[in-house]
Amino acid sequence: MSSFWQLLIDIFFPPVCIECRHRISAGMLCTACRKKLQDFRILQPRAYCCPDIESICLFYRYDAGIKKALHEVKFHGKKRLLAAMADEMSILETPKRVCAMWNLPANIVVVPIPTDRKRVAQRGYDVPQGIFSQWSQKQGFVWCEALARIRSTEPQYGLDRSERRKNVRGCFNTIRDIRGKPILLVDDIFTSGATAEEAANILRKQGASHVWAMAFAGGADDDK
């Protein structure tokens, strides 16, 4: 979108905090609500049966305004909120701290978990890509869409953990050479870990040296 049209949108529809509805200049939350809703967590992969992942980081709890915003983006075509989520990644300090804490190598490759092609076609955009691509490039990381879905899957919500793992089993393949490369796997939502582990498993089988995982939100019962 051109800067002129974006300016008009901001004038007539100024951005507001998704939680308290107060005016904001960037991102999707005001400072107070950001402090309230941020739920930075490092998860132990073993607890989620994710042996192919070194460590997992979540930035927001999938609840309240965050959950509503992601639903608006994923099911109601609110692409403008997707841009706000990308801004939010730039505003947050925790992603930078996590990268430093994990001591990620300089040649880290950021790989988004691909959304089912049917859902991308319906929405007109890919949510993980929209949230993380700009952020990764600002960090100086290589952005690489190295994974593709080779079959469609059912939505994960409503399925138990074993059903989710069965649903995504064998749904990914690599479309780029990632042999010997360290990978930072990114997604919009992390819940049971089924999708992330399946993606990490194929990356490791295809030669990735290490895989870390990062998600915008997590901790509820829904998934992709």
Q: What are the functions of these language-model segments?
A:
Residues M1-D187, T191-K224:
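Glycine-rich phosphate/pyrophosphate-handling loop used in enzymes and phosphotransfer proteins
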